[in-house]
Amino acid sequence: MLRSCAMRLRTLGATPARRPEATRRLFSSEEVVCKDYALPNPSWTKDLRLLFDQFMKKCEDGSWKRLPSYRQNPPQALQEFQTHFVDSKFKKEEQMSKAQQFTRSLEEGLGFEYAMFYNKAEKRIVCLFQGGLHLQGMPGFVHGGAIATIIDITAGMCAFSEGIVMTANLNIDYKKPIPLLSVVVVNSQLQKIEGRKLFVSCTIQSTDEKTLHTQATALFIKLDPDKPLT
């Protein structure tokens, strides 16, 4: 299932280029003038706010970095992504300008509420996730597809630290259902790199780490700027 992890540019506001270090504004201090949806809003529960504050304190010494999250791609990032990776006939610019990041397309509190933190030394992403009422599968619980989505974007961010990537494979073991509006911790780790292949592991646990909700492994492929996607 070749699902686009490349559109994580939405979150990063990154500018694709041949040099990976120049592509990811997410991992730099460069400002992007857009609303950042990875900040507290009235829908966040006390548990989510508490965890967010704890990780913000970890950011003070520079070991962790909070990652911003936007609803739409900055125009320049979108244009340069298409220039490097997509045939010009693929989509018209006016069409793509209306596209929104899937996980940010619902009203605040109803869908995906999350904040991500990146540890460069550990090659790890931690996502604090609260599933809203419009993510329901079985009554009272988060839909398995929504869980797969939050795993995909969290694991993808680990891989994205190495370059622009797409999801090639995602294997998920659902252990315990996740109640709606509960807060869980999605922990993703870059395990190894083999050429353009990046292997990532991921778990979802309760905030007290006593309950393992989900385990997953993922394979991402680093894109080649000389080979358009279409």
UniProtKB/Swiss-Prot annotation:
Its EC number is 3.1.2.2. The modification Phosphoserine is found at residues 28-29. GO terms for molecular function: long-chain fatty acyl-CoA hydrolase activity. The modification N6-succinyllysine is found at residues 46, 57, 89, 98, 197. The keyword Repressor does not apply. The keyword Repeat does not apply. The modification N6-acetyllysine is found at residue 65. Substrate binds at residues 175, 196-197. It is found in: Cell membrane; Cell projection, Ruffle membrane; Cytoplasm; Mitochondrion. The active site is at 152 (proton donor/acceptor). Phosphorylated. SUPFAM superfamilies: Thioesterase/thiol ester dehydrase-isomerase. Keywords: Acetylation, Apoptosis, Cell membrane, Cell projection, Cytoplasm, Fatty acid metabolism, Hydrolase, Lipid metabolism, Membrane, Mitochondrion, Mitochondrion inner membrane, Phosphoprotein, Transit peptide. Pfam families: 4HBT. Residues 1-27 form a transit peptide. GO terms for biological process: fatty acid metabolic process; negative regulation of phosphatidylinositol 3-kinase/protein kinase B signal transduction; regulation of mitochondrial membrane permeability involved in apoptotic process. It is a peripheral membrane protein. One of its GO terms (cellular component) is mitochondrial inner membrane. It catalyses: hexadecanoyl-CoA + H2O = hexadecanoate + CoA + H(+); octanoyl-CoA + H2O = octanoate + CoA + H(+); decanoyl-CoA + H2O = decanoate + CoA + H(+); dodecanoyl-CoA + H2O = dodecanoate + CoA + H(+). Its main location: membrane. PANTHER family: ACYL-COENZYME A THIOESTERASE THEM4. Belongs to the THEM4/THEM5 thioesterase family. Homodimer and homotetramer. Interacts with AKT1 in the cytosol. Has acyl-CoA thioesterase activity towards medium and long-chain (C14 to C18) fatty acyl-CoA substrates, and probably plays a role in mitochondrial fatty acid metabolism. Plays a role in the apoptotic process, possibly via its regulation of AKT1 activity. This is Acyl-coenzyme A thioesterase THEM4.
